[in-house]
């Protein structure tokens, strides 16, 4: 007995019903990013494992537990990218891209070995955007305004909230980590197993624990904001003042940290309470040391990533986008194989004149009644019938399914009717 063929756990197929929403969202992404002068780049899904370890941090969950890594035939250790920023930074260093531009965006699959659940998959798609060379809070603000504009264009701005924080510099966090660890060690018996592990590897990640008991415990913990420098604190205050001025609603979350070691200063997340546990739609922040740490010159930077699957889940749950799929605009039915060539020729002539129309020819061996039923179920606007009688008399029988009318039209008249209907 043959084993049933299945996809890999946590990796999913996507079909036209969902991809209609995906494509709609991607069009909005591209239009908005273009309006802010971002340029698209396309990056490999495989990178050398070492660059992720150096950039993300050896004691992060991503590197310790979640990366898909393997040796190729020459013994090179490679990893399916778990996120996009590191590959983008590698590309701009390797190709000297900062000589030409400083704003880039990319879209594609990422891979993490996590426990699959709604909104969290082992292969998932992200849109990422990165800005290099600017260290003031002005670009932090522009990034946040840009993402806010995306939500407005998609129609979800009323169902998504912004959380912001400053995690200071790496130097600021050294002293804070000591104080946080001292606080938590005295209460280690109250920690869950995951937090006990993080206490000795990456204690800052305890701050964003989803365990409510841990969050209650952290109410008494020292605050990171009390340990960041004057300049970092001033940067964050200026950003908050600017967001207030521009009408951006936000919440300061002192426990917001990012799971990747390269972040510093401003961090932010856009969340929705409509998605359950995996409620972060978009996350980002500054990473002013990463370019230099990866071998480039010192270059401040900031970026964000949007989880496409979670965004699609939100759009679907809010029912703000029609899931109806229009399979065709024009549905051509030929009667008799001798008229197949006429159907093909007509379809190509229409495509030449109206390249945006969706034209379907029914090549199935079905009776006329069945073919017409298929045309109706495909949500076609018009049916064009081509039979011996039509060819002999030089006209086409056209059925307008929306207006429930029939026409007998010469080819020139047919072309004009199509222009009239689909103008």
UniProtKB/Swiss-Prot annotation:
Highest taxon of the lineage: Bacteria
UniProt keywords, alphabetically: Aminoacyl-tRNA synthetase, ATP-binding, Cytoplasm, Ligase, Nucleotide-binding, Protein biosynthesis
Protein name in the entry: Histidine--tRNA ligase
UniProt GO BP: histidyl-tRNA aminoacylation
Subunit structure as annotated in this protein's UniProt entry: Homodimer.
Signal peptide segment: none
Keyword Isomerase: no
């Amino acid at each position: 007995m043959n084993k049933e063929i299945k996809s890999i756990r946590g990796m999913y197929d996507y079909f036209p019903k969902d991809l209609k929403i995906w494509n709609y969202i991607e069009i909005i992404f591209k239009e908005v990013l273009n309006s802010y002068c971002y340029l698209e780049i396309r990056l490999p899904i495989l990178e050398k494992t070492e660059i992720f370890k150096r950039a993300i941090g050896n004691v992060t969950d991503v590197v310790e537990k979640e990366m898909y890594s393997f040796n190729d035939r020459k013994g090179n250790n490679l990893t399916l990218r778990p996120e996009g920023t590191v590959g983008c930074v590698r590309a701009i260093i390797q190709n000297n891209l900062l000589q030409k531009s400083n704003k880039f965006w990319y879209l594609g699959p990422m891979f993490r070995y996590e426990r699959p659940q709604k909104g969290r998959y082992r292969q998932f798609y992200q849109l990422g955007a990165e800005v290099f060379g600017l260290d003031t809070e002005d670009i932090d603000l522009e990034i946040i305004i840009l993402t806010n504009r995306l939500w407005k264009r998609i129609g979800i701005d009323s169902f998504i909230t912004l959380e912001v924080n400053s995690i200071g510099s790496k130097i600021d966090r050294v002293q804070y980590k000591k104080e946080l660890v001292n606080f938590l060690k005295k209460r280690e018996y109250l920690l869950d197993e995951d937090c006990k592990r993080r206490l000795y590897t990456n204690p800052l990640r305890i701050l964003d624990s989803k365990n409510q008991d841990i969050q209650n415990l952290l109410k008494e913990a020292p605050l990171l904001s009390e340990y960041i420098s004057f300049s970092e604190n001033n940067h964050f205050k200026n950003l908050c003042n600017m967001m207030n001025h521009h009408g951006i609603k936000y919440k300061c979350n002192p426990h917001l940290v990012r799971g990747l070691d390269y972040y510093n200063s401003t961090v932010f997340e856009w969340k929705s309470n409509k998605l359950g546990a995996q409620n972060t739609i978009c996350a980002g922040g500054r990473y002013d040391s990463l370019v230099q740490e990866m071998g480039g010159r010192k270059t401040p930077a900031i970026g964000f990533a949007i989880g496409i699957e979670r965004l699609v889940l939100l759009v679907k749950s809010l029912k703000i986008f029609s899931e109806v799929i229009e399979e065709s605009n024009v549905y051509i039915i030929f009667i008799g194989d001798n008229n197949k060539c006429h159907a093909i020729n007509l379809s190509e002539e229409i495509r030449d004149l109206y390249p945006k129309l969706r034209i379907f020819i029914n090549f199935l061996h079905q009776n006329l009644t069945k073919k017409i039923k298929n045309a109706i179920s495909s949500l076609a606007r018009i049916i064009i019938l081509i039979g011996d009688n039509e060819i002999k008399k030089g006209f086409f029988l056209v059925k307008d399914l929306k207006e429930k009318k029939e026409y007998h039209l010469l080819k020139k008249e047919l072309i004009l009717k199509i222009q009239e209907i689909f103008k």
